[in-house]
Amino acid sequence: MSSYRLPKRGLVDRNVPLSFTFDGRPMQGLEGDTLASALLANGRMLVGRSFKYHRPRGILTAGAAEPNALVTVGRGGRAEPNTRATMQELYEGLEARSQNRWPSLAFDIGALNGLLSPFLGAGFYYKTFMWPAPLWEKLYEPVIRRAAGLGKASYEADPDAYEKSWAHCDLLVIGAGPTGLAAALTAGRAGARVILVDEGSLPGGSLLSDTATIDGKAAADFARDTSDELRSMPNVQVLVRTTAFGWYDGNVFGAVERVQKHVREPASHLPVERLWRIVAGKALLATGAEERPLVFGGNDRPGVMMAGAMRAYLNRYGVAPGRTPAIFTTNDTGYTLAQELEAAGVDVVAIVDSRPAAGVDYRGKARLVREAVVCGTKGGKAISAIEVHHGGRTETIAVDALAMAGGFDPIIHLACHRGGKPVWSAEKAAFLAPGSLKGLEVAGGAAATTGLAACLGEGAARAEAIVRELGLPCPPVAVVKVESEEGIRSPAPLWSIPGIKDKAFVDFQNDVHLKDIGLAVREGYSHVELAKRYTTSGMATDQGKLSNVNAIGLIAKARGVSPAEVGTTTFRPFYTPVSFGALTGAHTGHHFQPVRKSPLHDWAKKHGAVFVETGLWYRSSWFPRSGERTWRESVEREVLNVRKNAGLCDVSMLGKIEITGSDAAEFLNRVYCNAFLKLPVGKARYGLMLREDGFIYDDGTTSRLEENRFFMTTTTAYAAGVMNHLEFCAQVLWPQLDVRLASITDQWAQMAIAGPKARMILQKIVDEDISDAAFPFLAAKEVSLFGGALHGCLFRISFSGELAYELAVPAGYGESIADALLEAGKDHGIMPYGVETLSVLRIEKGHVTHNEINGTIVPADLGFGKMVSAGKPDFVGKAMLQREGLTAPDRPQLVGVVPLDPQQSFRSGSHILAKGAAATLENDEGYVTSSAYSPHVGSTIALALVRNGRNRHGEEVLVWSGLHGESTPARLCNPVFFDPQNERLHV
């Protein structure tokens, strides 16, 4: 045999050659190959380097559990790191690059880490870098973080499209192997709505690499004919290249379809990936079983692979992974592989069986070594020999590949996503799905059923029962005849091999070896969840699909208990990695949504503004000046200037709604929880709008400009939502009211003039008297400007705590008025300021935004309980606001927070803990909603929502951020840090 590609075997199309590159080297594959099979066909054993020790790694599996063959595929914005070569279909022009090596895959300087392996055992980072402590953030952590990771994500924008879809069915079949195909066919013929999903490119699963015959057909032909019949049924949808990744409440399943991941240039009218949310009446988990690796010295060497993988490459892809392989087995499947290799012309050197006798009658040419184990391997970048221990001695046998068959573990991850725990079966030597799963059944290999005929029969029987439960007539289930079936699996768990000299790996991707597990148990981390985190076993991108059960078995062996007593870690979505693009769907970029710019955008840009995106709006964030090195310097200057002189801020982005009609006042009285019916003309009032459930929806001011005309402002982010809410109330709840609504946000340019000198500046362009006596706080009216040349609306409201006004003028005049105000205030120190400064000013004054109004807050939580009108017969949210849970004394309440040491700071999102309390969920007292450095106070200040906070002013607490590793002693206080008597508002 001159090539690793066999002359006749496999499902690949030998008439369609495909060119691809690996690390820049040109290679050839065939239509139907995966990248992994094409690399093996080219004799490429070394495909990657391990995470920690940078050991040479080869292809281990033929499917989704692959921990070693992770590559980067594509270029530019389409470059995708950590792609499993075993799942990546080959296409013309595919470019793949190995990862986690420098300067090259063959010569990786990182392999020197192997010399340091005695110091890099389990939990080494907890023990090694204790002193000197100051070097942790400056040296140790940066070095570890740079060394961590595998592939590198692209910095370029993703050019492709993604989408989301919903689907509903009577029966969702997950897995299109023999069990899944039989189930889907039975239910489909009965008329049930069926969705069949499978992560492979072809339906069939293990049938595609099986040499058995079913009803006289080759297994692969049976799979093809069955899938063709399913596709012809109008009530059946077959989704290939689709991975079901999660099981959620309501029997909703998440799945991601790789629509165009198998082509070089995706068609522009199709998504690259599609996220499916499938609502199933019933679901059948037919995902099969994953072969279990064996833990022996050098089991990670390139050329060592799972027996099932070797069988797949042989029978499905027509590739012999080696010319002189050996097989190390604990069950009968190793003999099936040996027979198929020999039938393909491959010389099997030896079968090493850990048992005294096999369950099948093997009559091949390979040497049988019973009651023996492989205790080690030899070779550099590929395996060259195995060390076999038997009869009290160790023998070296030359090989160029080794298949290991350590038993099977049912793939039951999805069955455990809703809290169920796997159950250990001593009979099956495997963990099984929990019983009594509502809405989900498990069958076939996923239920530890063995034998092809048994899996086909079980799939059909389960589907028949589900169909009858749905009330549909079910025709008699056809009994298929299976010939040349694989031998019965006789499980004999072999957790570890005695006499190991080289590293024996449990978790291949994270370089967790046998000694790491033993060390964790000896050091007290014997609970499976602790051992997982201490060793990082099961925490790589494969989430322990191959390593978890071996790790549990080794922990059980070290503790002298059964795997049932050790238990398992918690299974959570996602089953395999899911791209952010698929989760985001079409919500990327701007699409047809407009970029919204305020009427003062160009004016702000002319004055050097730095902009920030707020929804669709671009808001001026701050205005840097020459010599200022950081944004904070600019913001502090602007804050101090507003407090000392005056500032001009663009607030045009606030939502503006005009409400008119003879019932406008009554309408507002019903949508706000506080009173608006008797608001005088010429006055503004702060209002709280509730949802039906009693929680605050939005806040803002509404001014009565005329008897039946009101001017409402909303928050920027909720402007559209508030408009929709008001229209719903007017059209559905109270259609009898005479009220009209108009969104006028874009018709007005609005600017805030704040600071002690605001009045003298504004008076220069406003014709009317705006003294405190003539125009007091919360006054509102239409005014004339420049001797009647222009009219606008003036509101005496303040978000800064200073004497302040908001002036609204027709949008087209915005820039001219802003220039006029700067000119009028040039002798008074006026400066433009942005939203960052506005945020500091409002935190100093204790004003809230949607950081505090987070959807779970009621008026009393913010200290606005007395605002709620008790005398009104009704308003939106009134009934639900009176619920017991919303009036409890220990609800979160708005407080201020200051650090005990003014030199320390804390972040928004940090948790509040009682002094001396441990950082646990039970001890969580609340969290920081907004924080900023206050030039007025001289330290960081914050607003927070804290349990029973108003009665805890003066209490010392700990502000803790586990994400950043920060703990700051602090004190709770009044949320109003500036002018608590409001004297500056009323000057």
Swiss-Prot record:
The keyword Nucleotide-binding applies. One of its GO terms (biological process) is tetrahydrofolate metabolic process. It holds the Pfam family Pyr_redox_2. The keyword NAD applies. Disulfide bonds: none annotated. This is Sarcosine oxidase subunit alpha. In the presence of tetrahydrofolate, catalyzes the oxidative demethylation of sarcosine to yield glycine, 5,10-methylenetetrahydrofolate and hydrogen peroxide. In the absence of tetrahydrofolate, catalyzes the oxidative demethylation of sarcosine to yield glycine, formaldehyde and hydrogen peroxide. It comes from Rhizobium meliloti (strain 1021). GO terms for cellular component: cytoplasm. Its cofactor is NAD(+). NAD(+) binds at residues 198-199, 206, 244, 445. It comes from the Bacteria. Signal peptide: none annotated. GO terms for molecular function: nucleotide binding; sarcosine oxidase activity. Keywords: Cytoplasm, NAD, Nucleotide-binding, Oxidoreductase. The gene is soxA. Its main location: cytoplasm. Its EC number is 1.5.3.24.
